[in-house]
Amino acid sequence: PAQRPSWNYRKEDDGGIIVDMLCHWRYVLDNIFGSVKGVFCIGATHIAERIDENGKPYKCTADDAAYSIFELEGGIIAQFNSSWTTRVRRDDLLTLQVDGCKGSAVAGLRDCWTQHYGNTPKPVWNPDIPNPINFSEGWTKVPEQEDFDNAFKAQWELFLKHVVLDTPFPWNLMEGAKG
């Protein structure tokens, strides 16, 4: 069975991973790393036919993969590969890796790992022997400092407080349109 409803894979039904995901990457980047100045994205349909909810084949007309490069203020470049065709082989369904001069961080939906540049392995390219380095070693799990509630619930609570109590709510129509 498909991992998503069939309309997601049909352009004529407003489907496609580009319209679904790039807006999310926009607010993640804007709010954590810096304002987005530009974006380049190429979409692809890697699976041309799928099976719908009733077991019938249908033609996929929407993009099921997006390869994006974002230019942020401060000279930061961000790259996102979004796919409804890729099988997961990493720590989490979503991982964000940030690399800097003094180290790296990999954040998933729940956990974050860091590696200081002093702990970064220095592999030597030799395809004739098995790789002797376990690249997962040398990473340190960031300790949990507090418990976090469900993010969607927290967002709805902020919105409802805004509607009922007129509290500030920065995620207005203009912010949504940026995506």
Description of each model-found segment:
Residues 40-41, 79-82:
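Short beta-strand segments
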Residues 1-60:
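Predominantly a Rossmann-like dinucleotide-binding segment in NAD(P)-dependent oxidoreductases
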Residues 64:
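Short, small/polar residue-rich loop motifs at catalytic or cofactor-binding pockets
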Residues 48-54, 58-59, 67, 71-72, ...:
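C-terminal glycine/acidic-rich active-site capping loop/insertion
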Residues 25-28, 155, 159, 179:
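Alpha-helical packing segments of well-folded alpha/beta enzyme cores
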Residues 77-79, 104:
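Short, mixed charged/polar active-site loops
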Residues 18-22, 172-177:
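Conserved loop-to-helix N-cap of the C-terminal "lid" that shapes the substrate pocket in Rossmann-like
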Residues 82-89:
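Glycine-rich phosphate/pyrophosphate-binding beta-alpha loops
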